[in-house]
Curated annotation (Swiss-Prot):
Keywords: Metal-binding, Oxidoreductase, Virulence, Zinc. Homodimer. This is Zinc-type alcohol dehydrogenase B. It comes from Aspergillus flavus (strain ATCC 200026 / FGSC A1120 / IAM 13836 / NRRL 3357 / JCM 12722 / SRRC 167). The keyword Transcription does not apply. Binds 2 Zn(2+) ions per subunit.
Amino acid sequence: MLEILADESVGGNSPTVIINRGAKKMQWPFIGCGGLGFSKTAHFTCFDSMTQLCEEDIPCIHLPPQHRSVYKMSTENKMRAVVFHSPYKVAVEERPIPKIQDSGDIVVKVTYTALCGSDLHTFRGIEPAGTGFVMGHEVTGEVVEVGSGVKSIQKGDMVVSAFTTSCGECFYCKQGFSSRCEKSVLFGCDHLDGAQAEYVRIPNADGTVMKAPEGVEEKYLVLMADIFPTGYFAASNAFKGYTPEQISEQTVVLIGCGPVGLCALINALEFKPKHLLAVDSIPSRLELARSLGAEPWNFQQDREGLDKRVKELTNGRGADAVIEVVGLSPALRTGFDLLRPWGTISSVGVHNGEIPWAGNDAYDKNLRIQMGRCPVRSVSPQALDVLKKNQHKLGFMADKIMPLSQAVEGYELFNAMKVQKVIFKAGE
């Protein structure tokens, strides 16, 4: 917080302003927006990325470029962050910039941080959570601090972080199951502040982050923190155990065409199944699915037609695989009903309800199912290969880039499903 003092006798377009910072006083003329004579002490919340200071009764005061370094120095320990207070209530607040707490930590100056569908589980109160923590788990940025034990990352590196931390050394990490690392913590919860901020501390950095590759725009690289690898994980599990020849004859149903679902769609098409049906109830999402190469189906308008179409394509058997990304029991049940015996359900939706079928139903179908959180760090190399080939198709994911300062509006838009994805640009 800066204290700004102005002399009443000073007015016009170049008032002299004294910055009171501790025992030191610095004085220089500011370039104003006209007629700024005033006599008062005004308090401003300031951030190192801003070049102007604003207060409701002072329209606009611009900091001269030659003094910006002084201004940045005086605010270097504060940042903006999106803080969760209660269901449906987040706020952009000033917080201390995080510091190294453990030798394996790094601190990243955030470039892009995104809003994920699973953030809405917290926002809507579906998933129990405390309050007062920084939201978000999708982030890219520049490393500005490095713990003494970090081996693979240096200051100045551009990185993308997985949405959960992983050590890279435990049994699960070595098996390729980094999502169940023995030291795993989810960003954006009671235990670890998240990435919707101007800076973020990342524990276990060697096993958690990936250096930014060449040839990928950073606004798309942020998708590698969660949703694109999750889409890869969902698709690869659906086809696991099958040869390319077998996959080329398969009919696959994707349930859910939100951001994760469309990432799963792009990844599934890389495996080249014979038919890929995309199911949702929102016309704009279905149109995107069509443009990406799937056959769209609105289940609310024509559920019976969907059933008939799957049977028609499979000689009455049912789908060979179902990819479910919604996280609701009715969606999982729909997938089960559309599936043939010995078929596979790959589910990455975050489920809080009970499994919607009985044990004998699964037994009679010889059901194969893979559920759970994506091990982002483990599958990142394979997922990145797919993203590099397909980033030209991802424009719809980056058509709503907002300043971090407008995060409250971003949450409202995303919660109302008025946008496909929200990406926040930190420092704005």
